[in-house]
Amino acid sequence: MAAALLARAGGSLGRALRARDWRRLHTVYQSVELPETHQMLRQTCRDFAEKELVPIAAQLDKEHLFPTSQVKKMGELGLLAMDVPEELSGAGLDYLAYSIALEEISRGCASTGVIMSVNNSLYLGPILKFGSSQQKQQWITPFTNGDKIGCFALSEPGNGSDAGAASTTAREEGDSWVLNGTKAWITNSWEASATVVFASTDRSRQNKGISAFLVPMPTPGLTLGKKEDKLGIRASSTANLIFEDCRIPKENLLGEPGMGFKIAMQTLDMGRIGIASQALGIAQASLDCAVKYAENRHAFGAPLTKLQNIQFKLADMALALESARLLTWRAAMLKDNKKPFTKESAMAKLAASEAATAISHQAIQILGGMGYVTEMPAERYYRDARITEIYEGTSEIQRLVIAGHLLRSYRS
C-alpha cells in the first residue's frame, strides 16, 4: 500500500523509506531539521491537500459532507494506516511521518484530519498493539486502503474525562459477549465499519474491571444516535453508539479481560500526538491566512505587515506554532524509540491545541470584519480549533497528566 505514497513522493523517498534510513533520526535531541525523506513526505501531503482538500473544505463544512472520495484516495496513498506494517497492508512508516502527514492534511481540512487521526491512532493503534494475529488480519488489513474506516468508543454521556467510570457493560453468555449501554461523542461513527468499545466486565473492580471489544458495524443490537450538529469539524460525523443486548463472538475481546483501561490510556497517548498534529495544521493554516491578508491589505498608506502591532501578533503566532510543533515531534520520536511518552504527548496536545485556538483567534483579529464572514476561511479555522482543546482529553486533563508525571519524577 505504501507504494503509491512513495511513488508520489519520488524514487529517492521510496528507496530511503524502504531501507528505513529515517529511523537513524530518532535520537530525540539529535536534530530539529527533518531528514530529506520526511521533507519530501511533507511536500507530497501538502500537494495532496492543496489539490484535493482546500478547494472543497468550505463546502464540506457548510453542508456537513463526509469526504468519501478524498478518504479513499488517502487510503490508496497509505495515509490511513501509516505505522501499520506493510505485511498488514499498511504504509510501514513511523509516528513522526504520521504526525507530519496529519498536520498537512489538517492544514487543508481539519475534518479530514480527524478522520485520518481516528483511523490511525484510535482504531488501528490498539489493535496493532494488543490484538492477536487473527484479529490483526481481520480488523486491520481491510481498514488500510480507504474502503473501510473505524472508530473508538470510550466516552459516555455521564463520563468523558473519567474514563474509568464506564457504565456500559459486557457479560459472558456461552460463546458470546453481550453489550449494553451508550457511548457518546464517537467520531467517524456514521461511516465506520467497526469500533473498539470499552465496557465493564466486573464493576466491583472499577477501572480494573474494564475490557475492550471489537464490534462490527452495523450489527444487531447496535444503533446509531443522531448526527451531532457541531461548532466545527463538521465534515466528520459525531454520534452516540447505543448497545442493546448487542451480541458479539467471544474472540472479539481485545487483549485480556480487565485490560481495557490500560488499552484505552495507552491508545489516548498515541491519539494525543494525532490531535496535536491536527491542531498544528489548523494553526499553520490560520497563520498563512493572516500573513497573506496582512500583506495585501493596506492601511495608513502601507500594508498591514508594516504596522508594529501586526508584526508583534505574527511573531507571537509563529512562536506558539513552532514551539508546539517541536513538542509534537519530540513525543512522536519518543514513541518511535519505544521510550515513555505519556507526559510528552500530553504536553504536545496541550501546547498545540491552545496554540491553534490562540492563533486562529488572532488571525480573525488581523482580518477584522473579513475574519468574521464565511468568504474567508479564518472563521472556520477558529471553529475547528476549539475542539482540539476538548477531545482525547481536555486541556485540564492534560495539565493533570503533566503535573502527575512531573511530581513523581521529583519524588523518585
Swiss-Prot record:
Its EC number is 1.3.8.1. Residues 1-24 form a transit peptide. GO terms for biological process: butyrate catabolic process; fatty acid beta-oxidation using acyl-CoA dehydrogenase; response to glucocorticoid; response to starvation. CDD domains: SCAD_SBCAD. Keywords: Acetylation, FAD, Fatty acid metabolism, Flavoprotein, Lipid metabolism, Mitochondrion, Oxidoreductase, Phosphoprotein, Transit peptide. Homotetramer. Short-chain specific acyl-CoA dehydrogenase is one of the acyl-CoA dehydrogenases that catalyze the first step of mitochondrial fatty acid beta-oxidation, an aerobic process breaking down fatty acids into acetyl-CoA and allowing the production of energy from fats. This is Short-chain specific acyl-CoA dehydrogenase, mitochondrial. It comes from Rattus norvegicus (Rat). The gene is Acads.
